[in-house]
Amino acid sequence: ITVAFPTNILEIETINVLASKIHLNLCVENMEVLLFLEKHLESPVGVFMKIDVGYNRTGVDSDDASLIQDLLSQMSGIPFINFKGFLGHAGHSYQCRSKEAVEAVHQKSKEKIIQLKTKYKAQYPNLILSLGDTPSCSVSEDFEGIDEIRPGNFVFYDLTQNIIGSNELDAIAVA
């Protein structure tokens, strides 16, 4: 199970309970959380580095090579952390109002995260790229280079998705 939003350190007890029972993946976007996990984890977890692919709300800027390298270096020395890869969420796709606009956001987001895999795949050959948001997963068919997609509420849809252009009204599954 991947908790696909930044790790909340106030949930460390729950994290430790879950990690002792399942294969748990967390998201990290800063050194403070990583250092906290280093001191408080009691069981192994996978860690995705949360990458900002353009929404500018959460995640490490995909161009911040120094911070990315610092986080990777720190992770490599933590016994209970297994670096899984890079994870992105194109939250800015929700501001789109056409399929073409969603596709443009998706392609740009995909490009940013794939550049990281290209840079780090020799050092981390099993690196996973995880990318997803409901609008992009609804509209785009091009996920080449992405290992895992996270379609959000794709199976239900709603009026917001209809306004964005992700679906037709008759595809809304929840009233």
Please report, for each region that a protein language model flagged, where it lies by residue.
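Active-site anion/phosphate-binding pocket segments in diverse small-molecule metabolic enzymes
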Residues: E100, A104-A175
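Active-site-proximal beta-alpha core segment in soluble small-molecule metabolic enzymes
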Residues: I1-C96
